[in-house]
Amino acid sequence: MRKTEKMKRPHNSSHVKQEERADDSHSNSPASSKSIKQENLLKCELCSTVCSSISQLQSHTLSEHVPEKKPSISTSNSAPSTKRVACQQCEDTFEDFAQFAIHMKSHLSSVTSQLFFCPICPVGTPFRDKKSQLEHLTTQHLQIQVTQHICSICDSAFPSPQAQSVHFAEAHKKYSCTNCDFETENEKTFKEHSKQHSRQLIMYGCALCATSYPSQLHLITHVQMSHDQETFYPPSLPIPTPPSPKSTPKQRVLQCSVCDESVLGEDGLDEHRLRKHCKVRFADKCADCQEPLLNETSFVEHCLRHSKDHAHHCPVCRQSLRSDSQIHAHCAYHMSHQDSTSSTSSSPITNGFSFVCPICGEKLDDGFALIEHTKIHL
């Protein structure tokens, strides 16, 4: 008779318990605790029990579904036992529980060995391969992104587009000619090039009538036809040199306290206050005594009459006057309306200048005086 096959329970139960404790201790390790958090719960296929780890499933299967059987004498009519232990992970079957336990350990080691955890994340983020772990570690924890703006000409790096623009404007400034396609970064070279697009024009002017001509021959013809009754050919004259201007002291730039406008010198500031901020334009009476102001003499007389501690002020607008030039300036400003009305009935102004020397700028009374004056430049 064939001997019936029986599932034998390991006789050394302490050995099995030691393996279970070893599995439990292995499951309590930091790596396994991380894997438990990430893996799904395991359900026993023999009952409705749900286990959180493979080792717990093994212990449950061992204690609940593998009963301890006593050896019995098999009869010749009994059929061989075909019940085998099945793995819930890969559906492999085994003849006894010892083989099943060894097989389950391989599943546990393979699961834990396939996961790679981030050493920086507090929750221990798992990854299936080393490449994913390194990519996460680099991009999330170790990467420092720095944006730089590179100059397209000299490859210099700058932290912002504004700094790059300032560098480009200062270091690579170009001077472009508007008449041609010439470009350069040197200012001196650009000025030399600009001379190619300019021409020199010499004009010859008449000192008597202030007319100008493009050539000396045209000027001679003009003098012959306009300023000489007889045939006259003036000799070639040297180019007159204007007299050197007298050196004047440098004036300070002052600021008006009313409108903050900048003017040159104290006289310029006084004139600015008079013409821009004086509220009384014309007046025919003194503001202090209400006597009429007939002319410049009476205006000056009232300035002296109403002065206090040698401090003069205008009898019309009461503005302080520092010098005689200011007194005459205020007189001309406030009494010009009277002068203009009286001048309509009187003779024309005798101190007007109609002739000006084109060489030195001196003003002369008539044309004959201008002719005599031009002789000093010959």
From Swiss-Prot:
Q: What is this protein called?
A: Putative zinc finger protein C09F5.3
User: A GO CC term?
Assistant: chromosome
Q: Which organism is it from?
A: Caenorhabditis elegans
Residue intervals of every C2H2-type zinc finger in the record: 42-65, 85-107, 204-226, 254-277, 284-306, 312-334, 355-377
Query: In its keyword annotation, does this UniProt entry include Protein transport?
Result: no
Which compartment or compartments is the protein found in?
Nucleus
The entry lists its GO molecular-function terms as: chromatin insulator sequence binding; zinc ion binding
| Basic and acidic residues composition bias: residue spans | 16-26, 62-71
Query: Residue spans with biased composition (Basic residues)?
Result: 1-14
Which keywords annotate this record? DNA-binding, Metal-binding, Nucleus, Repeat, Zinc, Zinc-finger
UniProt region (Disordered), positions on chain: 1-36, 61-80, 231-250
Q: Which GO terms describe its biological process?
A: regulation of transcription by RNA polymerase II
Residue ranges annotated as compositionally biased, kind Pro residues, are 235-246
